[in-house]
């Protein structure tokens, strides 16, 4: 009987390690994908007269991740993406702005995802808008210029439009990503 219990423990341990390995490799893959998206996006010039407007393609990873990973795993992916992209392609200020936008966006999307009645597109829109709010808040503090708040309406419209696009694409790819990764949808 003791031998059987020991075998069951070892079996659970092996399944647990396999699960951890699968989650770590999935997280690493998502970080790499987000980095690629960020880099490609940096090559696309968007000049609409207001600095800071981007498509936010890397947010595909964050939005989709909220539906297939645990909140902590998504948070780690967001932080790693911001830091790695910032160190490789940006500078200290870009890291600061991206951290503010990324963390606020993550928290808002996580909260809204947990509230019944918000679709993936709605969650994504809120993420796009809150990302811009976070960045403007940091810019106002760093530059000690409250007049930057006047950029906010345009950035909120841009965040809404890009949020819709990212949300629609995320909704379309979620079934394939969930199935391909062998992930179960997390409602956390």
Predicted regions span which residues?
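Short helix-perturbing small/polar motifs within transmembrane alpha-helices
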Residues: 4, 14, 27-31, 36, ...
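Hydrophobic alpha-helical transmembrane segments
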Residues: 24-29, 60, 64, 71, ...
């Amino acid at each position: 009987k003791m031998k059987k219990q020991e075998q069951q423990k070892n079996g659970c341990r092996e399944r647990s390690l396999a699960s951890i390995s699968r989650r770590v490799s999935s997280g690493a893959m998502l970080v790499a994908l987000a980095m690629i998206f960020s880099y490609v996006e940096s090559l696309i010039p968007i000049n609409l007269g207001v600095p800071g407007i981007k498509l936010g393609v890397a947010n595909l990873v964050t939005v989709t991740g909220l539906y297939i990973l645990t909140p902590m795993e998504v948070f780690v992916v967001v932080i790693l993406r911001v830091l790695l992209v910032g160190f490789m392609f940006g500078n200290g200020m870009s890291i600061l702005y991206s951290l503010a936008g990324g963390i606020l966006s993550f928290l808002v999307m996580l909260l809204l995802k947990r509230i019944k009645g918000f679709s993936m597109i709605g969650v994504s829109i809120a993420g796009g808008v809150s990302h811009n709010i976070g960045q403007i808040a940091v810019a106002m503090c760093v530059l000690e210029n409250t007049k930057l708040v006047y950029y906010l309406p345009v950035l909120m419209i841009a965040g809404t439009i890009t949020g819709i696009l990212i949300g629609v694409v995320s909704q379309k790819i979620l079934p394939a990503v969930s199935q391909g990764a062998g992930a179960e949808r997390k409602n956390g």
